[in-house]
Amino acid sequence: MITRMSELFLRTLRDDPADAEVPSHKLLIRAGYVRPVGPGLYSWLPLGLKVLRKIENIVRNEMNAIGGQEILFPALLPRAPYETTNRWTEYGDTLFRLQDRRNNDYLLGPTHEEMFTLTVKGEYSSYKDFPLRLYQIQNKYRDEARPRAGILRGREFLMKDSYSFDIDDDGLKNAYIAHREAYQRIFDLLKVRYVIVSAVSGAMGGSASEEFLAESDVGEDTYVRCLQSGYAANVEAVVTMVPEPISSEQIAGLASATVHHTGDTPTIATLVDWANGADLGRTVTAADTLKNVMLKVREPGGEWELLGVGVPGDREVDDKRLGAALEPAEYAMLDDADFARYPFLVKGYIGPKALLANGVRYLVDPRVVDGTAWITGADELGKHVVDLVAGRDFTPDGTIEAAEVREGDPSPDGAGPLVAARGIEIGHVFQLGRKYADAFGADVLGENGKPVRLTMGSYGIGVSRLVAVIAEQHHDELGLRWPSTVSPFDVHVVIANKDADARTGATELAAELDRLGVDVLLDDRTASPGVKFKDAELLGVPWIVVVGRGWADGIVELRDRFGGDKHEIPVDGAAERISAALAGA
């Protein structure tokens, strides 16, 4: 096929959009692939839609290859199924809610587990109908508080979500592995650099969970990995290595807890300064202190309750880890009004004693094991307690993974230190188990004639996000550099000479390429060569053929936009040579 730029619906921009923060956002708008229509909302113009459809088809082919069957649910969904699973409430403000003219409640689907489960329950009733793998490629909607980075985080986005249905856990494991391997093939075809990390399931529920993260400095997700063992996880899923607890006899021999007047020491830094000037007989660091952070937490449909979180003083609380640990509950830090309401909370001097005495739930970092001694608040202004021992002087209500994970921390598998990096989530696979089947009573008749509850897997890929991810990983200072598998065209032919013979020759070359099955973009505009070259580099088609001054000598120039090489090739046989270059890309 030949597309003439003189007829193509396209306008490129020379300057970056004022609100664009990341390279993909800037380049996709400048190159005319997408246009913003509102916060987090984008129109797909012809070039952008071609890239999107190519990614979509790669995903579709791989899903079909593992036995997936494509269906399509509406984006507008009734409230009732999401009430059954409590996700009408759990999703909170991220859910787009609306009513029809009869005041019936609806939502714009953020995900479709409920609909898949109900559909399979309604259609199939025997173990003979399984295993089953269904998928859809559908727009999803989430009311992001701060849409950012263009199509990387929008309010409307295209996703592939697939679901496996099996009658036993072995079937679920097979489906999980099949999807995991299919995802690896997909991302390899798309030339995306990625890492697979352990993850938490969040509001989706379920047990085993892994994310596919595209490597990117602009990614919102932080992950860590151990280079010695290959362990990798996002920070929400990292399990803290727990020190060995000591025996009760050893605990009995520890120094007694003592309260000290520490003066004006409401911060960890001021407390450490005091401790090192107080002749405690040892050097004190922030890691020897216990910082107690106060929150208010509300379960879906419940009331606000106080929660104390104790972490070593050298660690900050990580909002993502805290949120993942508390999900589906929402939380907020206490403000001055809250502290005024609870006078036993002495800001800057909070300790476990007052929390436990007043019935406040108190969770601590896993490092706070029995026998560890801490310097922490004594619940009085200007006072702290030294050598407060866990398991002897206080017993928390449990542990919570809320402290930040740092580069250099020991890997949970004990193989070496962790290194940190940033990434963009492009895929997620879950072993959901029976959470949704339980919610809807999705049973079928088993081989023994008794009911069997279905077990499910859920597998998502951000199709529209992948357009931006590929643009992030494959661009330079001149513009985009699309891999051949997703480029809107195979070859961009630039007529860089006003000579009539060169124009005719370029048109004939494009026709020859078309006959060889090459998808050609022909820049037949009357613009200057400089404008045409800039647009060719900006648009990012992997192969650029320049028909210019060399035409009179029987020469055209072939440029590899992806690799950067340039070659002069004879006009005779040029189409075949270009086609061969494409085949080897």
From Swiss-Prot:
Gene3D superfamilies: Anticodon-binding domain, Bira Bifunctional Protein, Domain 2. One of its GO terms (molecular function) is ATP binding. Pfam families: HGTP_anticodon, tRNA-synt_2b, tRNA_edit. GO terms for biological process: prolyl-tRNA aminoacylation. It catalyses: tRNA(Pro) + L-proline + ATP = L-prolyl-tRNA(Pro) + AMP + diphosphate. Its EC number is 6.1.1.15. InterPro entries: aa-tRNA-synt_IIb (IPR002314), aa-tRNA-synth_II (IPR006195), aa-tRNA-synth_II/BPL/LPL (IPR045864), Anticodon-bd (IPR004154), Anticodon-bd_dom_sf (IPR036621), Pro-tRNA-ligase_IIa (IPR002316), Pro-tRNA-synth_IIa_bac-type (IPR004500), Pro-tRNA-Synthase_IIa_type1 (IPR023717). One of its GO terms (cellular component) is cytosol. CDD domains: ProRS_anticodon_short (cd00861), ProRS_core_prok (cd00779). Homodimer. Consists of three domains: the N-terminal catalytic domain, the editing domain and the C-terminal anticodon-binding domain. NCBIfam families: PRK09194.1 (NF006625), proS_fam_II (TIGR00409). Catalyzes the attachment of proline to tRNA(Pro) in a two-step reaction: proline is first activated by ATP to form Pro-AMP and then transferred to the acceptor end of tRNA(Pro). As ProRS can inadvertently accommodate and process non-cognate amino acids such as alanine and cysteine, to avoid such errors it has two additional distinct editing activities against alanine. One activity is designated as 'pretransfer' editing and involves the tRNA(Pro)-independent hydrolysis of activated Ala-AMP. This is Proline--tRNA ligase. It comes from Mycolicibacterium vanbaalenii (strain DSM 7251 / JCM 13017 / BCRC 16820 / KCTC 9966 / NRRL B-24157 / PYR-1) (Mycobacterium vanbaalenii). The lineage of its organism: Bacteria, Bacillati, Actinomycetota, Actinomycetes, Mycobacteriales.
